[in-house]
């Protein structure tokens, strides 16, 4: 750690080089996933029957049956025994048009080549040709390249892949052609004879340049909704979307002024922006300098946006499943939702952390007088006290509804409960949004669209292979109540993180916080009430509330989908949901949530011993242990451990086996860091085991 430097150019070069290393790790990881798909998976069998065969790409090898661990290889259908996977890669590969393991091998090797290139680039751009600081601060060129090249050309390339490879292959697969009879992509992508089978591909680019775009409407569609055969978005709709996105981003990448004297100048934009209403001082003046000299500030904004985007992706993945047969693979749907929600939560907490680090290390009050940031900091008391009031209001009222319901149900007075069958609290605004979205197709808002974006808004159930792919999601009193719990927990998380940022440099209690740094345990001895007040401690506390918030979110999602959406569709069209619609009545009380969700659904993981799911039973216990271990760090005082260590050192000295280095107890901050890490690891792994054992056993 002696190599730490505050030289901005050197820091920028190190970060830039590390990015290439990070990309190399990602390519190696992806290569491993594709190699497993090619070598150890049942992908080709799944491709021939994605309804009754489950995805598997891991087979536990028997170790002379000493342990008997091959019990974990469950029957996933088609005579294949292995561990059921829930990554969604099989569905993605089918959407890509991959039909042979050789294509997966080629991609895996290609990813390793790319990893090697990235490692070389990381070395080259640090040791041989490191960019100058001016290059890192040239934001207009950066925006143009990221928008036009990365997002624009990236989307254009994916649109091209969808049109030339995915659409023909998926058309054949949907028509029942065996994957073995479909040629490799490399054999037909340039074969005019093959393309002639799909007449729309043979019209060339002439209609494009003559603006006669309508002739492409058979593979660039506006159908809307889901494909009833695969339960996913229409691939032709996706191709249309990606092409449109590509055009928009390529245009967007020409907006900023570089070598030619046209386009926006980012500094002029920010300096000139005063806001829509009233007098807000100097507006955004000074923000350009902040964002080009503080990578913490830049990172904080990017993390907040990317984290929010990840949570939005989580919702789109189930409402508008993008890949064929993804919607009927319930374990994968639950895993993808949970994964994207948690990733989003961690990134948003990271945004709070780096914003606070910026405030302490990079913020210069003298350069920010009466601008937007200065004005926010100066009325931070009003912001935080209002946010605190909102949290108190939401907490007491939302939790109070549950307390009321538990009390009434306990006393045998169901007619006095808040429920759909007694005192109704209908989410009328959410229901209004649903009805607007359900009716949007063909209306003035979307005249050319054939159907609403998804059946979730209201509409017919889409059944694939006797399973519900997607159906309307009814909202009622139970949803209204838990949504206010979501509002409460999210607002508390925001309160903690924002307070950490706005009071990072000073507060009435500790005026010299900026001198003490990002992480300090307490403001010295003899100064009560100043522990857990540093910016780092706000991140520490924010992590717990983030975990708390998102646990309720994923529990809500898991139970709601099992209750009201996922299930079996019978030949007469009737639907039997997994938990037979019990969410609306049971989720109204705390007791109901414990009894009918946590306890009832934990039966799968608790009773998993002796089955292929038994590893989840072991994981469930081990993760509980890790979680409980964290409490030892979170509840302890440092003095206890130091005193214990000193008595142990005394015993070693008596036996003349004392080490030369005197051991020390963890610092308060270290103890908290170890505590929160194990708390989150234990909690997440417990939930992982609970969810997967449940949904694999019933899904």
From Swiss-Prot:
Annotated signal peptide: none
The record's free-text note on cofactor binding: PSI electron transfer chain: 5 chlorophyll a, 1 chlorophyll a', 2 phylloquinones and 3 4Fe-4S clusters. PSI core antenna: 90 chlorophyll a, 22 carotenoids, 3 phospholipids and 1 galactolipid. P700 is a chlorophyll a/chlorophyll a' dimer, A0 is one or more chlorophyll a, A1 is one or both phylloquinones and FX is a shared 4Fe-4S iron-sulfur center.
Residue positions binding [4Fe-4S] cluster: 522, 531
Membrane-related topology note: Multi-pass membrane protein
Chief location category: membrane
Domain of life: Bacteria
Keywords tagged on the record: 4Fe-4S, Chlorophyll, Chromophore, Electron transport, Iron, Iron-sulfur, Magnesium, Membrane, Metal-binding, Oxidoreductase, Photosynthesis, Photosystem I, Thylakoid, Transmembrane, Transmembrane helix, Transport
Subcellular localization: Cellular thylakoid membrane
Binding, phylloquinone: 641
Quaternary data: The PsaA/B heterodimer binds the P700 chlorophyll special pair and subsequent electron acceptors. PSI consists of a core antenna complex that captures photons, and an electron transfer chain that converts photonic excitation into a charge separation. The cyanobacterial PSI reaction center is composed of one copy each of PsaA,B,C,D,E,F,I,J,K,L,M and X, and forms trimeric complexes.
Protein name (Swiss-Prot/TrEMBL): Photosystem I P700 chlorophyll a apoprotein A1
Organism, as annotated: Prochlorothrix hollandica
């Amino acid at each position: 750690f002696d190599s730490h430097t505050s030289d901005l150019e050197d820091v920028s070069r190190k970060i830039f080089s590390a990015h290439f290393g990070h990309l190399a790790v990602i390519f190696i990881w992806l290569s491993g996933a594709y190699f497993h798909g090619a070598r150890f998976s049942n992908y080709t069998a799944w491709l021939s029957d994605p309804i009754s065969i489950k995805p598997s790409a891991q087979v536990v090898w028997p170790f002379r049956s000493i342990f008997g661990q091959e019990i974990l290889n469950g029957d996933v259908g088609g005579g294949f025994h292995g561990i059921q996977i829930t990554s969604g890669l099989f569905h993605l590969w089918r959407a890509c048009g991959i039909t042979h393991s050789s294509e997966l091998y080629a991609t895996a090797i290609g990813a390793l080549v790319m990893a090697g290139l990235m490692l070389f680039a990381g070395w080259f751009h640090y040791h041989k040709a490191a960019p100058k600081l001016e290059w890192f601060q040239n934001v207009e060129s950066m925006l143009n390249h990221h928008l036009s090249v990365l997002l624009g050309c990236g989307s254009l390339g994916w649109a091209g892949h969808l049109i030339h490879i995915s659409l023909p292959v998926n058309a054949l697969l949907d028509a029942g052609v065996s994957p073995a009879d479909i040629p490799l992509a490399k054999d037909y992508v340039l074969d005019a004879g093959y393309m002639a089978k799909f007449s729309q591909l043979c019209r060339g680019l002439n209609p494009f340049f003559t603006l006669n775009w309508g002739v492409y409407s058979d593979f660039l569609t506006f159908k809307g909704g889901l494909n009833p055969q695969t339960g996913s978005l229409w691939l032709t709709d996706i191709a249309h979307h990606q092409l449109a996105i590509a055009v928009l981003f390529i245009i967007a990448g020409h907006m900023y002024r570089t070598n030619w004297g046209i386009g926006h100048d980012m500094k002029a934009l920010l300096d000139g922006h005063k806001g829509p209403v009233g007098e807000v001082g100097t507006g955004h003046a000074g923000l350009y300098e902040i964002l080009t000299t503080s990578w913490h500030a830049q990172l904080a904004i990017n993390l907040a946006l990317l984290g929010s985007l990840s949570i939005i992706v989580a919702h789109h993945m189930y409402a508008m499943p993008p890949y064929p047969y993804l919607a009927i693979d319930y374990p994968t749907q639950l895993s993808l939702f949970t994964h994207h929600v948690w990733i989003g939560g961690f990134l948003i907490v990271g945004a709070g952390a780096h914003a606070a680090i910026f405030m302490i290390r990079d913020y210069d009050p003298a350069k920010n007088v009466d601008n937007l940031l200065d004005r926010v900091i100066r009325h931070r008391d009003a912001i935080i006290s209002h946010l605190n009031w909102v949290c108190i209001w939401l907490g007491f009222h939302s939790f109070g509804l549950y307390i009321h319901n538990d009390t009434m149900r306990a006393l045998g007075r169901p007619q006095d409960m808040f429920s759909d069958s007694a005192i109704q609290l209908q989410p009328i605004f959410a229901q209004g949004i649903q009805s607007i979205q359900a009716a949007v197709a063909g209306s003035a808002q979307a005249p050319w669209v054939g159907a609403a974006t998804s059946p979730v808004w209201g509409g017919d159930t889409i059944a694939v292979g006797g399973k519900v792919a997607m159906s309307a999601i009814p909202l009622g009193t139970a949803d209204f109540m838990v949504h206010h719990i979501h509002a409460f927990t999210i607002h508390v998380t925001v309160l903690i993180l924002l307070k950490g940022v706005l009071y990072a440099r000073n507060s009435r209690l500790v005026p010299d916080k900026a001198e003490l740094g990002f992480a300090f345990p307490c403001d010295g001895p003899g100064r009560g009430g100043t522990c857990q007040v540093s910016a780092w401690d706000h991140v520490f506390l924010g992590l717990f509330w983030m975990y708390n918030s998102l646990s309720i979110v994923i529990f809500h999602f898991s139970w709601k989908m099992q209750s009201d959406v996922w299930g079996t569709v019978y030949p007469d069209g009737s639907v039997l949901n997994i938990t037979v619609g019990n969410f609306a009545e049971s989720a109204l009380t705390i007791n109901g949530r414990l009894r009918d969700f946590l306890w009832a659904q934990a039966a799968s993981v608790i009773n998993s011993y002796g089955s292929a799911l038994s590893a989840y039973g072991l994981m469930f216990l081990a993760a509980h242990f890790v979680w409980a271990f964290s409490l030892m760090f979170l509840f302890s005082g440092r003095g206890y451990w130091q005193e214990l260590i000193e008595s142990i050192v005394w015993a070693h000295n008596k036996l003349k086996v004392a080490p030369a280095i005197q051991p020390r107890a963890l610092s308060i901050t270290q103890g908290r860091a170890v505590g929160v890490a194990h708390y989150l690891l234990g909690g997440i792994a417990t939930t992982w085991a609970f969810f997967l054992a449940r949904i694999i056993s019933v899904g």
